[in-house]
Amino acid sequence: MASPDLSLFTYPNETPFVELDCLAAFNALTDKEKLYAHYLSQASWYGGLIVYVQTSPEAPLIFSLIHKLVTAESVEDLKKTAIESGKATEDDVKALLVYISGILANSGNYKGFGDSKIVPNLPKERLENIILTSAAHKADPKAIETLWNACADKIYSLEHSHQHLGFGDKGTTTYFTPNCTLKDSELVGNFMKKYNLEGYNNRLFKYEDDGKTTYEVRMASVLNQQDDEPFLMKDTIYEGCTFRVTRGDYSGLLELVCQNLEKAKEYASNDLESNMLEQYIKSFRTGSLDAHKSGSTYWIKNKGPVVETYIGFIETYRDPAGMRGEFEGFVAMVNKEMSAKFGTLVAHAESLLKELPWPSTFEKDQFLKPDYTSLDVLTFSGSGIPAGINIPNYDEIRQSEGFKNVSLGNVIPTSFKGFRHQFLSEADVAMMDKFAVTAFEVNVGLHELLGHGSGKLFRKEGDQYNFDVETVINPLTNSKVTSWYEAGDTYDSKFTSLGSAYEECRAECVGLYLSLNQDVLKIFGTEGVEAENVMYTTWLNMLWAGSAKALEMYSPASKKWLQSHSQARYVILQVCLEAGEDFVKVTETEPGKNLLLSVDRSKIKTVGKKAIGDFLVKLQVYKSTGDVKSAQEMFNKYSEVSDDGAYPWARWRSIILAHKQPRQIMVQHNTKVNGNTVEISKYPATAEGFVQSWSERFSSSKVESLLESLWQKDAKYFYAEPPAKLSAAC
């Protein structure tokens, strides 16, 4: 078997770093608001360390090792000592700093966008040399060597099952033990549905106990099994297996989260914020998902806060079963000027929903107008920073209470800095350079508010339906609806691993479809010729992402898509290519070297609108009715990467990879309490600045030992041979 292409798994030394600036917004806060933001940020950063435990068996140790390295001495001293030793070059040290940055930016050694492994861009022996000359090693050689020996091989391993996230037989995950397969996931999913459990805040451990297969559903909580407070349920026999619901996952880290949320509560601006934080604390303390839902309800009702935040086990993209949430937390300040535009969009939402191509019976009975704000991010912890969010993800709350939309205003322009658009004509490159930021703001606004915020799920609870089963007609069959969500079903539990890419595709299509509306473009400050250019750029950018970027996130070996948004955009491209009439074309202009994407802008409002509209009807009908089989068949067809025909994407992937640009890493601020005020720190947009920001991030010295103890607790489930104790390092 050929060796894997290392460029797919490394961050090159020229990886760009950009500053996520929010100084003006933060400095405009009152002292009380700054203290509120600070403690929420601390809670988010401590909680973000949970993602290392959720990513791979070795990730907690990698964090502990690199954190010891960068806190024992300055980056400059680390670099100077390594180079002067003669055992490492300046390029070696740069490669290490970029690797460390990649690990910290993704909260683990797998990319948050693409799920592929991150390995160092320098030989193992050179990395070891730098570690052995470090101040951390001089201070405690036994601890550093113990950590290095425990994770060195895993850091560099590119065995097939280590290259990407996935179930244990095909990939790496710690949401499940390695002996779990898709069949185990389905069995556990059925058990959880029967007993009204959801997967957001748990992991699954499979083992033998007294000769019987046992599935341990371990809930995230501060409290452990031995604590007296009543818990969920006793051991249960289901399908001949023992199911054991336990708690105490990530206990020490969640304790630090709760401590900081308690402090933040002292500076809350109203009862809604206090109640919200109280419920989050209860959820993280006990493992109660209902408490987090209650906190989310208070959060929705807290309209237009000056400091916005959300925290918990949220997005399910990286669980191979699509049910378990990765921890994330964000803290941000409202950008009033851009928020006013989103407020106007919300005011027009009900009329815009009527323009969507599915029948009104497939839309929610009542549109619950959400809070929609543009935010300047102070803190975003997790495996990546998105441009926009539509939360909470709990179906029942979204249908009954509503949701919030946030556009991360300082993320959008930052993400376009220094970017080159390949595979386009010079005229289209100029168009993208001029209008891409505005077009992306339009797309994000529509995607979050009316994409994720639209559509009804048909449900049956007991003998009651939430739709008229006698009169509602399926527009694809012209007959009555014959499928729906039963009691205990959620979108995630039914659509599982398909769910994320499918829903992102639906939201992206809504954004494209409604970007043709002149009133929408006017809301975002564009009219006339400029509005037409923004509309064209919105479509061009989506189709460019589907052709020029998406296949970076596809694995030919496993024929698996590695990232939901990339798969969604590729699918949209295929739908538009299928529409014909020379609306969209991709040609190989230089054999084996270059491609050209062209979009006939005169056909967007005709051919393009019809293609996306017809596709949207299918997407929504299958989602509303819970028709997973039809959804899967359709989505798989458009997701196929063929190596022949007019568009041999499998062959063209090598051309796309040859033009690949390294993904940016965003440098975030830190805050620190000084008396009754909060100081904010700014760092250079370099690998050195990024690493320094992390070396100064945590006020508690316990983070390394907590992650090491969590690794030790789980090690027997993830290693064939029991690993060495880390007592020397703890």
Question: Which ranges hold each PLM region?
Answer:
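Active-site recognition of the HExxH zinc-binding catalytic motif
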Residues: T30, N270, A439-E461, A507-E508, ...
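Long, well-structured alpha-helical subdomains associated
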Residues: V51, T490-C505, C509-Y622
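Short, glycine/acidic-rich hinge or "gate" loops at secondary-structure transitions
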Residues: K79, I83, D271-E278, E461-F467, ...
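Extended, compositionally biased alpha-helical segments that mediate assembly or anchoring
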Residues: L596-C730
